[in-house]
């Protein structure tokens, strides 16, 4: 590709509204352009990378025995009503009506549509197991789209769905998809880790996420220092306390704390140990009888919202109560809330259930209770695992301790069981002629998100460093002053032709530009191999070669350059 015929829209300056490196570099490299919040156009450089990832995903899915189909992005709302997700999915599901006042949704996922297809097309166990996939645009009306294509409203996804009459074939397909995802990420040249995960709004029994490792990742991965155990922190079980509750040693006292609205301020101003404090968080309840629920965790712990959402009394999806609702129910603001005397259901983390002589808000603005003790000052509350595990705590697997690292989720696989097939009456006749409800699996890969994840893992202060398999171009040709030197122009043109003939994807910078600009663009875009052609090199019978990842420079004889570049890709 000649740059003079190409839309190369690079930028020198880092956009002010781009928070993460991948978003910054995708804008600067001219890969994407924002059309509206969470909506992006893919320009030529970005699209080339996207299509390469898509091709690898398609190859591995086909190899694993999945069959490609294509379903509509616009889906009839009736199908979502059948499964109950029309209401449960929340505002991320974009709902609209056509000119005939019929309800539709823009698909964030396709479980309903695929189940509808299979219940109409498959009626016998002889047609199973069946694994179908598509690569299709999705839409989720994110409340705060951010990080470019990492968390956009519209995105490209590969989603596969499998159907089974028995658990044995379900397990076999799940393992095949697990391996296919591992193969995809390996071929992309990315460091990754599969982890056990929560099934979330999609539901089901077994689930694994695939994370590209990056310091900028939104997800925390908890893994054992001495085994293969790894889980999203949302899923990782915190250890039960090994100690017992100590006897009370002090009376409960009411203390003025006008300037202590956070645990940190309470600890600093009043000298109480953070392990002797609790946080009382008010969340929305699941019933009209209990519209608010209190969740209590230790002051130095973090609430695990996924675990809290699993409480029957808590509304799903999980949502904190707003300040107005809290004041109306309790008479105090969030900085002064505590479990003593609360007129609502109270649930505590296991670590809180063994505390004694602890401090908490007094449900009066600017006041706290110190010296609180269970049974004496407030009734025992049901205890659950409601917190995030902490680095250094024992691993749930029983081997080693927990360490934490950050990752970007790019894939997720589930065993759904009969969640959707039962709701939508997707049944087949088994070998005995009896009707059986289908078992389902679903397997998603964020194709567009993988582009951003690859950049987060592969960049430096000059730009992107693409893994070879997904670089927009493999080789860049930089002819120095070719518009003034016929020798440079002729040799550059010949090399361009030779590399194209060899099946190597080339970006030929034939612009009338300063060498500094040309070098900067090649490094920003992340072309893995760059060949520099100048009169001085030609006099010596050499090309100058530079490797983008290592920064290594070499002089390569003119007649050996094509074979040399072929070898770099092997």
Swiss-Prot record:
It catalyses: tRNA(Pro) + L-proline + ATP = L-prolyl-tRNA(Pro) + AMP + diphosphate. Its EC number is 6.1.1.15. It is found in: Cytoplasm. InterPro entries: aa-tRNA-synt_IIb (IPR002314), aa-tRNA-synth_II (IPR006195), aa-tRNA-synth_II/BPL/LPL (IPR045864), Anticodon-bd (IPR004154), Anticodon-bd_dom_sf (IPR036621), Pro-tRNA-ligase_IIa (IPR002316), Pro-tRNA-synth_IIa_bac-type (IPR004500), Pro-tRNA-Synthase_IIa_type1 (IPR023717). It is an enzyme of class 6 (ligase). One of its GO terms (biological process) is prolyl-tRNA aminoacylation. Signal peptide: none annotated. GO terms for molecular function: aminoacyl-tRNA deacylase activity; ATP binding; proline-tRNA ligase activity. It comes from the Bacteria. Transmembrane segments: none annotated. Keywords: Aminoacyl-tRNA synthetase, ATP-binding, Cytoplasm, Ligase, Nucleotide-binding, Protein biosynthesis. Pfam families: HGTP_anticodon, tRNA-synt_2b, tRNA_edit. Catalyzes the attachment of proline to tRNA(Pro) in a two-step reaction: proline is first activated by ATP to form Pro-AMP and then transferred to the acceptor end of tRNA(Pro). As ProRS can inadvertently accommodate and process non-cognate amino acids such as alanine and cysteine, to avoid such errors it has two additional distinct editing activities against alanine. One activity is designated as 'pretransfer' editing and involves the tRNA(Pro)-independent hydrolysis of activated Ala-AMP. Consists of three domains: the N-terminal catalytic domain, the editing domain and the C-terminal anticodon-binding domain. PANTHER family: MITOCHONDRIAL RIBOSOME PROTEIN L39/PROLYL-TRNA LIGASE FAMILY MEMBER (PTHR42753), PROLINE--TRNA LIGASE (PTHR42753:SF2). Belongs to the class-II aminoacyl-tRNA synthetase family. ProS type 1 subfamily. This is Proline--tRNA ligase.
